[in-house]
């Protein structure tokens, strides 16, 4: 038995539909890889205060239960949060008028460069330096006065 030309056309159309459908599914773009932000999460200080770093801001939690979210309102309209990389020299240079603190920062930072998260809030700023996946060095500055604090991932 020989198939009619109409049957052959139907088979051809069906096979083309199946092939095109398979190609469309094969060419569907996969969702973009989500890059994990190594800073995001909860960090604890030696005094048991915690800092929550979110993708777009920082929340400071005091041991007494008070919390402050750094944002445009808390920073009187002068808020900036950014990620980047800084050299060891640039990080030590954040406290130019405090040579002892500058030396302490240099002693802690042994690599040439580090990932950083920087917060500018009103007249003060905070630079969080990722030492490894479990530790951050926080460099706080208010004008010319600086301080540092080690944080551990909670």
Model-predicted regions and their roles:
Residues 3, 45, 62, 121, ...:
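Acidic surface patches and DE-rich sequence motifs
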Residues 4-16:
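Bacterial N-terminal signal peptides that target proteins for export
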Residues 23-26:
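C-terminal motif of bacterial Sec signal peptides marking the signal peptidase cleavage site
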Residues 28-30:
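Bacterial signal peptide processing site
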Residues 34, 38-73:
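Short, solvent-exposed loop/hinge segments that bridge or flank secondary-structure elements
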Residues 37-42, 55-58, 110-118, 135-137:
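Short, hydrophobic/aromatic-rich segments at coil-to-beta transitions
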Residues 49-50, 65-132:
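Contiguous, well-ordered beta-strand patches that form the walls/edges
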Residues 131-154:
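Edge beta-strand at a domain terminus
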